[in-house]
Amino acid sequence: MKQPRSTSRRAVAIGLLALAMAAQARAEDTCSALAARALPDATITVAEAIAPGQYPMPENPLTRLASFSGMNPAGRPAVGPNPAFCRVAATLRPSSDSDIKIEVWLPLNGWNGKLLGVGSFGWGGAMMYPAMLAGLEQGYATAATDTGHDSSTEEGKGGQFALGHPEKLIDYAWRADHLMTVHAKELIKAYYGKPASRAYWIGCSLGGLEGLIEARRFPDDYDGIVAGAPPNPLVKFNAAQLWPGWLLGRHRDVNMTKAKLEMVSKAALKACATPIGLKQGFIDDPQHCDFEPEQLQCKGTETADCLTAGQVELMQQLYRGPINPRTGEVIFPGVAKGNENLLGDFVDGQAFPVALDLFKYAAFQDPDWDWTTLDWDKTVNEAVSKLGPLLHVGSDLAPFFDRGAKLLLYVGWNDFHNGQELIDYYQSLLRDSGPAAQASARLFLIPGMGHCYGGAGCDTFDKLATIDNWVEHGVAPQRIVASKVEDGEVVRTRPLCAWPQVARYVGKGDVEDAGSYACVDATR
C-alpha cells in the first residue's frame, strides 16, 4: 500500500532532524574532548559547548567599550544572541611569572574555515567579548587574550602590572598575542580536522599596535591585519599625551581655559570645514586646514572671543607637539586642527593617566616618578631605549607583505591621536617595505571619528568583510562605505577614501548619503 505523501515527508523530516541532532552531539563531544588536549606551556581550563543564546556576556570595561557600533569588526550596530559554539579557555605560562588567559570560540555549525584574532584596548587586562561574538556570528573561529594580566584587580589596573614584572611586560607587548594565535590554530585543527584557511587580526588603539607588532615579529601569523589608531611609536605617542598637561601646567599665568579652547576649535571648524562638514560638526581634511591661532589674537583688551599673545604662542606649541630641545626634532605631532576642545581636561596641568603609567611603571619602574620633571630629550630617549625594542614597530614589514598579507590602517581625524603621525608612518612603510607594500597596504583617515569610535563622523564600517575581500579576491579597498549609528539606527553614510584621497560632495543628491560623494585628490 502506498504511503501518503505527507507521511513520507514527515519521515524524511524526522530522519534529517535525527541526523542533525547526531551531528550536533558529535560536535559537542569533540568540543569536550579538547579539555584533554596538550598545548605547550598551557592548561585548558574550559572546553564546553554553548547552546544558541545561552552565553552570559561577561561584564568588564572592555566589554562595554566593544559594544559600541564603531568598535564592531563587522560594522554592525549591535551583536545578537550567540550562535552555538565550542568555548575553549586556557591559561598560558611561558615564563614562571606569566599568567596569560586566552579564549578560542569555535562555531559548532557553519564555520567559514577562517580565524579572527581580536585585539585589546588601553592597558588590556580583559577580553573584547562582543568583538569575538561579532566574528562568531560571521562564521569565524575567534580568539582573544587578556594580554597576561587582570585589570579588575588592584595590581592589574592600568600599567601597574608591569612594576617588577618584566616577563608580564613581555607578555603584554607581544607574547600573549602570538601564543594565543598559535594555540588557536592548533585548537582549530584539532576540532575541525583541518587548519584554518585564513587568519585575520582586527584591533584598535592597543589592538592596532598589537596588529603591527604581529606583522613585524610574526609575519606568518596573519594573512590580513586591520590596525586602527595604532599608538606607534608607543613611547613618543605617550609623551605627546603628556605634552598638553605639562605645557599648560607650566604656563598657568597665560590663563588658557576650556572656554578658550572651545572657541579656538569652533574658529578652526568655521575656517576649514566644508559647508556640509560645518553643519555636521567636523573638518573633512585637517591636514590641509590653513587656520592659524594668530587670526584670533586680540587687537586690544582680551575678550572671550580672542586670544592673548601668550595664548597664541601656547596654541602654536600645542599644534606642533613636543620637541626635543637638543635636536629640534618633533617627537610626535600635536593636536589636529579642529580638536582643540579635546585639550580642555588639561588646562590645570593634569597628566593623561594611560601615558603617565607607561613612564612610571613600564619604563622607569617607579610609582613615585614625578612627571612634571620630564626632560623632553633625556627622559623620552631613556624610555625609548627601555621599551622601544619591545613595543615600537619600524617601517620595514617586507616579510609580511612579501607573503601576500594585507594591512589596513585607519584613524579618526577627531582623535586625540593626531592622524598626521599615521600618514608619516604609512609613507615610510611604503618606502621601506619593498615593492609588495604598494599593493598590500592602505590607509584611511576618517573625518569626524574619535578614538576608534564615536564623534560626529561615520565611525561604523565592515572591517572584517573589507580585509577578507582584499585577501581572498585581491580587491584592494579604495572606497569603504561607513555609517553613523544613533540609537541603533543608521542616520548617515559617507565613503571613506584611501589616503591621499578624500570624500567630496558631488553637488547633488542627499548630503547624508554616501552615493552623493566621490573620492578625489585632496587639495588645500
Question: Where are these predicted regions, by residue range?
Answer:
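Bacterial N-terminal signal peptides that target proteins for export
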Residues: 2-13, 229
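Bacterial N-terminal signal peptides
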Residues: 13-22
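Catalytic-loop region of hydrolases
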Residues: 27-113, 129-130, 279-283, 292-369, ...
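Cap/lid segment of the alpha/beta-hydrolase catalytic domain
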Residues: 74, 112, 121-193, 239-240, ...
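Glycine-rich nucleophile elbow surrounding the catalytic serine of serine-hydrolase chemistry
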Residues: 126, 203-213
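A catalytic-pocket lid/entrance helix-loop region that shapes and gates access to the active site
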Residues: 169, 213-215, 220-323, 445, ...
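Alpha/beta-hydrolase fold nucleophile elbow
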Residues: 194-205
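Short beta-strand/loop motif that positions the catalytic acidic residue
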Residues: 408-411
